[in-house]
């Protein structure tokens, strides 16, 4: 039960962070200036809720880690165990994760003028911190630095891809209104950015696997089999993304009324598969790769 709680908290934390990152990415960079305020208003409530869950899950994960290190649920609620966790490498990094999650929530609630850029930088910093815990710390020396840097790139690219899909769906709603031109601009910018994000996810994901298990990656363990399932699901997402961009988008120029609903449905499917991938990632963190 404690392990399941850890998996659930990791899923909530990753998903929340990626949503805040994706919305901030649109508000700070991808959306044209004329609709940035409109997008910020549309995403604000969801961003705030995601920031709350990010902070709650990060804090709870520190306590649950104490239970995993100790004797179970009793140690989850022990301040002495929390202090012991903070003395570990995980605890030292995770304390900053909690601090940044708190600052992210404060920014989302206070809504300063440059909020999207601040949230973008804060969530990026949290993904970099996440690369300093887990399987990315298995190596030593220069290899460890390469692995952690690569894992940070993997997380940021994944957040740009997965976190940007919900804003895509909302921009599709704007296409039929007065903001049509600006919405199309935002979608095209995300498409351009998405190409790099997908390539980054694939390249860094392969390198991550090689740095953890070596070549060829092992498929005899539960960890290896889950990694293979994750890779298959990611490739399905790639196929959907390519079909959207290079099949449905050209068709929208000819018959928007028929192609647009398919585009929306496929994007929802892509997002749902991405959520399943995040569940698998959360589960992989609890397993030994060997």
Swiss-Prot record:
Pfam families referenced in this protein's UniProt entry, alphabetically: CopD
Taxonomic superkingdom: Bacteria
Membrane-topology descriptor: Multi-pass membrane protein
Record carries keyword Cytoplasm: no
TM stretches of this protein: 11-31, 50-70, 90-110, 118-138, 152-172, 196-216, 223-243, 261-281
InterPro entries reported in the protein's UniProt record: CopC/D, CopD, Cu-R_CopD_dom
Subcellular location field: Cell inner membrane
Entry similarity comment: Belongs to the CopD family.
Name the UniProt record assigns to this protein: Inner membrane protein YebZ
Organism: Escherichia coli (strain K12)
Protein's gene: yebZ
């Amino acid at each position: 039960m404690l392990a399941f709680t850890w998996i659930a908290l990791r899923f909530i934390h990753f998903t929340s962070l990626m949503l805040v990152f994706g919305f901030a990415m649109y508000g700070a960079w991808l959306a044209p200036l004329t609709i940035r305020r409109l997008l910020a208003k549309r995403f604000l409530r969801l961003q705030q809720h995601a920031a709350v869950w990010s902070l709650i899950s990060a804090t709870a994960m520190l306590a649950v880690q104490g239970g995993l290190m100790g004797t179970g649920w009793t140690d989850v609620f022990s301040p002495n165990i929390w202090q012991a966790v903070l003395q570990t490498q995980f605890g030292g990094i995770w304390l900053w994760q909690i601090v940044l999650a708190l600052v992210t929530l404060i920014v989302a609630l206070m809504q300063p003028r440059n909020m999207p850029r601040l949230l973008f930088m804060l969530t990026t910093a949290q993904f970099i911190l996440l690369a300093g815990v887990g399987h990315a710390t298995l190596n030593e020396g220069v290899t460890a630095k390469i692995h952690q840097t690569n894992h940070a790139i993997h997380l940021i690219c994944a957040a740009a891809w997965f976190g940007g899909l919900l804003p895509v769906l909302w921009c599709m709603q704007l296409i039929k209104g007065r903001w049509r031109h600006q919405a199309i601009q935002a979608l095209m910018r995300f498409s351009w950015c998405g190409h790099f994000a997908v390539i980054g996810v694939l390249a860094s994901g392969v390198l991550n696997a090689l740095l953890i298990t070596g070549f060829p990656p092992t498929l005899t363990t539960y960890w290896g089999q889950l990694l293979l399932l994750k890779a298959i699901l990611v490739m399905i997402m790639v196929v959907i993304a390519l079909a959207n961009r290079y099949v449905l988008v050209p068709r929208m120029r000819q018959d928007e009324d028929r192609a647009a609903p398919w585009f929306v449905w496929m994007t929802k499917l892509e997002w749902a598969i991405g959520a399943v991938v995040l569940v698998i990632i959360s589960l992989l963190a609890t397993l030994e790769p060997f």
